[in-house]
Amino acid sequence: MINPIAIKLGPLAIRWYSICIVTGLILAVYLTIREAPKKNIKSDDVLDFILIAFPLAIVGARLYYVIFDWDYYLKNPSEIPVIWHGGIAIYGGLLTGALVLFIFSYYRMIKPIDFLDVATPGVMLAQSIGRWGNFVNQEAYGKAVTQLNYLPDFIRKQMYIDGHYRTPTFLYESLWNLLGFIIIMILRRRPNLLKEGEVAFFYLIWYGSGRFVIEGMRTDSLMFASLRVSQWLSVLLVVVGVILIVIRRRNHAIPYYQC
């Protein structure tokens, strides 16, 4: 089993979980700043947004997780702020981040759709990297299986949980997000292919569809009615993404994304 603590300096413990999140954040910021000038967005605007949105997104991701596991946290309220042990939900972070983006864009007089288009690829890459924090923490895994011989030894050993090998759903989602990142980076460079906003809407469809399938393999995620909470949200993302693309394709006044 991999030690979740990567570096220990006296009382300070730096966890792999945190390293994965921060690494993803740094790369996302770099990619966004590099693309932002094409939409007349200043790098200072990107950095200011991150300084506001990132901590709020972490809080939103934690609150989302706590709300849907309220019975446990009602009995263990001291566990609510202990996010370094895991237990943050990406959908909570995304919803919070999107809300902050719309408010921030309004006050900075930036088109929200432009900000979404330049930031989306970085978000996909950050999510791909962040899932490896779940790997180290032995969370976001799937059903028990008899063997995982197709995987490298270090993954196979880490996926041996409670006496069984577990389906590495963290890996599936990480690779799915990485593939989506590569595809959207290629499509975004093709002239007159994507309209403004369709980078972000592609993300809704791609991530939502992949997450719906992968979430069905998990055993540790939150349930609501007959589906997992994340599956309900995944369906919503896909439907919204498809509707928005259809609407924009029918509106010939909407320009194409400028490479």
UniProtKB/Swiss-Prot annotation:
Domain of life assignment: Bacteria
Enzyme Commission no: 2.5.1.145
Transmembrane segments: 9-29, 48-68, 83-103, 114-133, 167-187, 197-217, 227-247
Gene Ontology MF term list: phosphatidylglycerol-prolipoprotein diacylglyceryl transferase activity
Cell location: Cell membrane
Pathway as given in its UniProt record: Protein modification; lipoprotein biosynthesis (diacylglyceryl transfer)
Positions that bind a 1,2-diacyl-sn-glycero-3-phospho-(1'-sn-glycerol): R131
Key words, A-Z: Cell membrane, Membrane, Transferase, Transmembrane, Transmembrane helix
A GO biological-process term: lipoprotein biosynthetic process
Membrane topology: Multi-pass membrane protein
One Gene Ontology cellular component annotation held by this UniProt entry: plasma membrane
NCBIfam families given in the database record: lgt
Purpose: Catalyzes the transfer of the diacylglyceryl group from phosphatidylglycerol to the sulfhydryl group of the N-terminal cysteine of a prolipoprotein, the first step in the formation of mature lipoproteins.
Family: Belongs to the Lgt family.
HAMAP family the UniProt entry points to: Lgt
Name this polypeptide is given: Phosphatidylglycerol--prolipoprotein diacylglyceryl transferase
